[in-house]
Amino acid sequence: MRKRARIIYNPTSGKEQFKRELPDALIKLEKAGYETSAYATEKIGDATLEAERAMHENYDVLIAAGGDGTLNEVVNGIAEKPNRPKLGVIPMGTVNDFGRALHIPNDIMGALDVIIEGHSTKVDIGKMNNRYFINLAAGGQLTQVSYETPSKLKSIVGPFAYYIKGFEMLPQMKAVDLRIEYDGNVFQGEALLFFLGLTNSMAGFEKLVPDAKLDDGYFTLIIVEKSNLAELGHIMTLASRGEHTKHPKVIYEKAKAINISSFTDLQLNVDGEYGGKLPANFLNLERHIDVFAPNDIVNEELINNDHVDDNLIEE
């Protein structure tokens, strides 16, 4: 029996490239043995609703084609359900942090090859209050860069748009009082920003979590304490090399459950999109989603080798 795949795509991502190549993508998947259909999103929340519908219709595979925001919506559509379909990823956004972490090719046909080859691995996701995320949650003015950067600037200079906007915001940054409880420990004090990471790639910084594991059941918690502009610039430089973890203003920990609160009205960034405001409870859901990934990911330190699943297409 042929497997059924549903593509959920953002038609505006990647300068509408996927929309143009959709017919070829459908043909490629059909030749590989999939009965395939596609759905184009029109507004925020569409990908979540369509993922839920596809689950009810018992699709074997869901393919998210778009940026990290589209992927986040698809994950939110399936995370609470039993017998979740496998997830395929076609990175079409500006940064594509999750795709980077799993070494998924940025070209459409290369990403489809990963799905067709059939190798998959289970990865952790995070639950924040009543929603889910697959890459990161963060707070602090600098973390607002990804959803405050103009779309036109992103289309012109790509990922560099975030750095341009980030440097523009640096002088405005202010520390806020935070209480962060994590696995029996407590941080209480002034901080500029915090990150909860599930992968090694956040906002294009591929060494922000140098010891990341995608399936170990732990968040990486990074807290940047109150710092002056020179100190913050130094931390960012170190972060580009994965050398920030020992900086005296950086707290770097692993935790399964985290609670964050503040008297300040602090916005949250979840997978690159606006995620509401504090307070927030975070829980790591270990190996919760089964994702297609290149076979060589088994040789990477990001994945525990004894967890890797080799699930090939049944012809």
From Swiss-Prot:
Catalytic activity: a 1,2-diacyl-sn-glycerol + ATP = a 1,2-diacyl-sn-glycero-3-phosphate + ADP + H(+)
Residues the record lists as binding ATP: N10, P11, T12, S13, G14, T41, G67, D68, G69, T70, L71, N72, E73, T94
Amino acids binding Mg(2+): K213, D216, Y218
Effect caused by changing D97A: Loss of activity
Keyword Nucleotide-binding: yes
Enzyme class: transferase
Protein family according to the UniProt entry: Belongs to the diacylglycerol/lipid kinase family.
Protein name per the record: Diacylglycerol kinase
Organism name: Staphylococcus aureus (strain MRSA252)
Gene (UniProt): dagK
